[in-house]
Amino acid sequence: GQNMAFLQAAQTQPVFSSLNFPRAVQHLNPTGSNKILLVVNESWGEPQNPALQKAVLQGLLAQPAFENVQHGSFLFVGAIVEGEMRELCNASVKGFALKLAPPQQFTDCLPMQYRQQGYETVAMHGASSQMYDRFSWYPKAGFQQALFGEQFLGKPRCEAFNGVCDSALFDEVGKAFSAN
């Protein structure tokens, strides 16, 4: 079934194609910002109850340090790596053996664009670097530093994917912003 298809996709040479979905980064306007935080978050959707959505975002929106916060949702179905490719590289991908993809496939990715503009680019993911071959394609996409679950031993793990919980990485994000 679905699990077998997923396992097969993880071993399949990736095929990239034009994007047929909207992207959240289309609303990103970093002009004049010397630091940018982009969070690509796998989600089961926005709550139908607007009050619940407001409660979820309340702490973030109350932060005085943000110059611009935008949020929203759109319909998308696929694995998290497909969302990453959509947002970071403006591409759709079938087949997740991304270590097999040539570096030139990633030259237009957002981290590479920011890197070429002089930004320091750092990626963090609580899962293993082996998952979706992130150890291979994150550097190709332009991330100068990539930190994964292997670097966060001892931090709390979430059962949904057995990786380090996003909330346990907040201090690591702060350290990265302080260092760059």
PLM features: what roles do these ranges have?
Residues Q2-S178:
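Soluble catalytic regions of membrane-associated enzymes that act on cell-envelope
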